[in-house]
């Protein structure tokens, strides 16, 4: 039996804070300006859960790099797809919890950091973005600045919760349609979801849209099969969200595309992530091996900290603060429609902290 564990990080930073971490914000923003200028519009950005905390979506890890919810036990990929009575119960448990957990993620709005990142793309300073997040917030932010934005400029490394597909035939549909099907088949759960929305007393939601429920019997919960399979009169297949589960690997297409983006980039800007997952860490490792300049702006220890000895620069601070100051200065001396678009939305965005998050903005 293969043992699969949730990626963890050291309890303490592997390297002491650098001089970049203690620079006043204006000087930190000036350093970012120099980094992007040298990138000449070919800098690629890599983001993680930390950038979505201010949108009310809890990060996996806190400011010290420790797992924020050590008692949380997500469904692993092999459990979800197991063809047995046990697997059937895992699917009931996953979809019941995700049915309640998806609406807060679906309804979340971009925060200022998402707007800043979209601005860097829209201005052509760092047009390509790789994100580990599955919350769709980067796309929402970019579409505000540019309704005709290129979807190909954002690569979702771990997929998106906004879509689902069946495993046997790869029939894809919007998540909202599947949510409606779940609600129709589970009226009691649907009423619970509506009550939670009315009162605001939603259970704790994790970044993958799963929630914590205790003492619940999932046997009465019905998981809809793929309706497209039924319409096409083929064997119905189980449905999963378009996200990479723990224990599942990213597709070869996404892996190759992400590595190609790094190979073609002039530099790599990392924002709000501890890089605990190998699929993201591998990209930084590749950039270092290719001698690309790398700047990381995030809080707490990360898996990539040893790369500081190989030339990676790290600012141990909240990314949004630096990005916002940099863009304030950048748009002062620039002109054009893109600049006007950015000015219109620059300091907008909704800040809605997760109810149980206190202190500094965690960037996991």
Where are the regions that the model predicts?
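Conserved catalytic core of sirtuin-type NAD+-dependent deacylases
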Residues: 1-364
């Amino acid at each position: 039996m293969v043992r699969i564990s949730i990626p963890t990080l050291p309890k303490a930073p592997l390297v002491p804070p650098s001089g970049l971490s203690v620079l006043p914000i204006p000087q930190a923003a000036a350093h970012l300006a120099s980094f992007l200028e040298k990138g000449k519009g070919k800098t690629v950005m890599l983001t993680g859960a930390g950038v979505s905390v201010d949108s009310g979506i809890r990060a996996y890890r806190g400011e010290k790099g420790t797992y924020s919810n050590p008692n949380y036990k997500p469904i692993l990929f092999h459990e979800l797809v197991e063809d047995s009575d046990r697997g059937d119960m895992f699917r009931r448990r996953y979809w019941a919890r995700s049915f309640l957990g998806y609406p807060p993620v679906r309804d979340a709005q971009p925060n200022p950091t998402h707007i800043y990142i979209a601005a860097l793309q829209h201005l052509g300073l760092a047009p390509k973005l790789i994100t580990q997040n599955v919350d769709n917030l980067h796309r929402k932010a970019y579409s505000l600045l540019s309704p005709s934005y290129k979807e190909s400029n954002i690569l979702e490394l771990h997929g998106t919760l906004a879509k689902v597909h069946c495993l046997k035939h790869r029939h894809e549909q919007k998540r909202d349609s599947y949510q409606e099907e779940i609600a129709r088949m589970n009226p009691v759960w649907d009423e619970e979801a509506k009550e939670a929305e009315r009162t605001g007393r939603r259970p704790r939601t994790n970044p993958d849209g799963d929630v914590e429920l205790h003492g619940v019997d999932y046997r009465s919960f019905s998981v809809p099969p793929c309706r497209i399979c039924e319409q096409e009169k083929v064997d119905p297949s189980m449905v999963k969200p378009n996200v990479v589960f723990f224990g599942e690997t990213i597709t070869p297409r996404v892996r190759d595309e992400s590595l190609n983006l790094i190979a073609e980039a002039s530099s790599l800007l990392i924002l709000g992530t501890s890089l605990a997952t190998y699929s993201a860490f591998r990209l930084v490792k590749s950039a270092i091996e290719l001698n690309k300049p790398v700047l990381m702006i995030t809080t707490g220890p990360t898996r990539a900290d040893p790369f500081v000895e190989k030339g990676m620069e790290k600012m141990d601070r909240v990314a949004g603060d630096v990005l916002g100051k940099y863009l304030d200065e950048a748009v002062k001396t620039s002109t054009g429609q893109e600049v006007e678009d950015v000015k219109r939305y620059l300091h907008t965005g909704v800040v809605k902290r997760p109810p149980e998050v206190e202190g500094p903005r965690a960037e996991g």
